[in-house]
Amino acid sequence: MDNLVFSLNATVPIFLMMVLGLFFNKIGWMDEEFANKMNKFVFRIPLPVLLFGDLAVVDIEEAWDTKFVIFCFIITLISITIAIGISCLLKDRSIQGEFIQAAYRSSAALLGIAFIQNIYGNSGQAPLMIIGSVPLYNIMAVVVLSFFKPGQNGMDKALLKKTLTGIITNPIIIGIAAGLLWSALKLPMPVILHKAVSSIGGVATPMGLMAMGATFDIKKAFGMIKPTVIAAFIKLVGFVAVFMPLAVVIGFRREKLIAILVMLGSATTVSSYVMAKNMGHEGVVSSSVVMLTTMCSAFTLTGWLFIMKCFGLV
């Protein structure tokens, strides 16, 4: 019951922020133009700062576990490949990029540390899970959203150049790279800078969620119900069912298993919607999957956690 309450405390406020954005839109306080500008702002400033802050304070040398980081990286890559393969079965190819990203991209950076701290009292292996998965999440998101952009026909030199440029100049990837470099160089984080980073990064999630809620089109969402449900099932159940037994066989236990669970089975991150909108996609599938996985993840995560506890794995 405690785990269910914790999961609900982590996910219900996120869902309510989206509903609040939708409410503000309906009463005329937050129109679509304003919400789109808010999206761009979150994408360019608060979200990169949030990821920088998460990674800059990690002591990589002390926490490092090569096998664990490589495992997180490889299963993330395989998950993306599976999502791409399943997306080829979709009739509407214009939503393929959004479907792929929504099916694999977790709230790892936001929920990982908090979830493990709630269970074990310390962040454990969450920072290493973030290092092994989050940079790849974002690099592949740029590639997928560029290649499967509506109206795009195949890969050519121009698109390849544009995609590589997009990776290098993507604000989120710059934030991750800066955070990893800061951590690797063991640079101190002055109190003033830490507070500034925390304050700026702290607005990323609420602003992004409200902007998403304000632009959420219920009629369009119901029109995309089938790909939304499929992507949500893959995100919350499919990947965990496939890869968690493998993690157990390899020998991962306790904090590492919880970190892998969050990486594979947490709700689709709001940044997937922010990035999709800012890279020329409609955003309907992204926002729908974020909403559905957010509503359901408290129960699916708790269910997975209960199963692992029954087997004495955590």
Say what each PLM segment does.
Residues 1-314:
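Alpha-helical transmembrane segments of multi-pass small-molecule/ion transporters
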